[in-house]
């Protein structure tokens, strides 16, 4: 199992020499998935936006390095951009892949013939140097989720909704729901709860829980900002332009970063928020 992205790249000649490949999420049309780029960005010490959320920082040196590394997986190392990971993993064509941990559910049910021959592992990381001079591997990964919101002027409704939210997100409710749905539908319905205490009480093995616990400590999310919808849209455009048209990664990313920042400025003005006088 590769500890770092460099380890993964070093494995590719052996894997590809056996007519196999590795599955890395690509921003396709149906579901633009940039999680691997975001992971590389965080691992290099970068961020998607600046601290005041007034502009994107993908045009930083960390952002450019991460983008060059990510697109090189397809342009330089020949990883596929279109594939069905579950089918290829099951057949052995793709023995390694990086996907959200709920893919475990699908494989458990759809590939019973390889049960016990595979497992989950922590995300490949990037070697970094700490302030004291020691080296460590940064396994930061992109995390996202849903939220519960209350939109009403009624005080009674607010209180009732708040009580419901507290009950639904409680450990007891999450464990009960997770266990009952898995009892009815099987391991394909293993519940991806956001309650950390509830995860410990679901049907994960101790080895799997160890991986999940460790990866959770490296989870990073990015804030929602005014005009933020342009970020994913044009990051996807940038990746496709580099992989399809073979344009220069640095120049392509810098061009789209300017487009993203222009939209962020427009939306901040619409909402009466302060903007950067000189957006980088």
Task: Give the location of each predicted region.
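Glycine-centered hinge/linker elements that transmit conformational signals in sensory
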Residues: 5-14, 51-82, 123-126
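Extracytoplasmic/periplasmic solute-binding protein
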Residues: 6-55, 62, 94-96
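Short helices/loops that flank or line small-molecule/ion binding pockets
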Residues: 9-15, 83-97, 237, 241-245
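Periplasmic-binding protein-like
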Residues: 12, 165-190
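Bilobed periplasmic-binding protein-like "clamshell/Venus-flytrap" ligand-binding domains
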Residues: 16-29, 170-180, 261-275
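Extracytoplasmic/periplasmic substrate-binding proteins
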Residues: 35-39, 43-44, 68-163
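Short amphipathic alpha-helical coupling segments at ligand-binding clamshell hinges
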Residues: 62-69, 156-168, 176, 252
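Long, aromatic- and glycine/proline-rich binding clefts that accommodate carbohydrate-like moieties
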Residues: 121-125, 132-134, 179-241, 272-280
């Amino acid at each position: 199992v590769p500890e770092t992205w460099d380890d993964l790249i070093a494995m590719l000649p052996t894997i590809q020499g056996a007519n196999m490949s590795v599955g890395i999420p690509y921003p396709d049309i149906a579901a633009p998935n940039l999680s691997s780029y975001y992971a590389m960005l965080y691992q290099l010490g970068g961020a998607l936006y600046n601290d005041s959320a007034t502009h994107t920082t993908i045009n930083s040196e960390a952002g450019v390095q991460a983008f060059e590394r990510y697109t090189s997986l397809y342009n330089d190392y020949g990883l596929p951009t279109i594939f069905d990971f579950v089918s290829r993993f099951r057949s052995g064509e793709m023995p390694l892949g990086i996907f959200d941990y709920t893919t475990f559910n699908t494989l458990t049910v759809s590939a019973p013939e390889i049960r016990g021959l595979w497992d989950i592992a922590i995300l490949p990381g990037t070697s970094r140097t700490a302030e004291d001079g020691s080296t460590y591997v940064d396994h930061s990964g992109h995390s996202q989720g849903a939220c519960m919101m209350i939109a009403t002027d009624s005080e009674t409704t607010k209180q009732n909704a708040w009580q419901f939210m507290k009950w639904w997100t409680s450990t007891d409710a999450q464990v009960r729901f997770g266990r009952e749905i898995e009892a009815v539908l099987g391991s394909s319905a293993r519940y991806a709860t956001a309650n950390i205490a509830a995860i410990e009480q679901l049907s994960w093995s101790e080895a799997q829980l160890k991986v999940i616990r460790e990866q959770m400590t490296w989870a990073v999310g990015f804030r929602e900002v005014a005009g933020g919808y342009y970020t994913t849209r044009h990051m996807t455009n940038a990746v496709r332009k580099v992989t399809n048209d073979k344009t220069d990664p640095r120049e392509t990313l810098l061009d789209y970063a300017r487009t993203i920042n222009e939209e962020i400025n427009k939306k901040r003005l619409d909402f009466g928020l302060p903007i950067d006088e000189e957006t980088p």
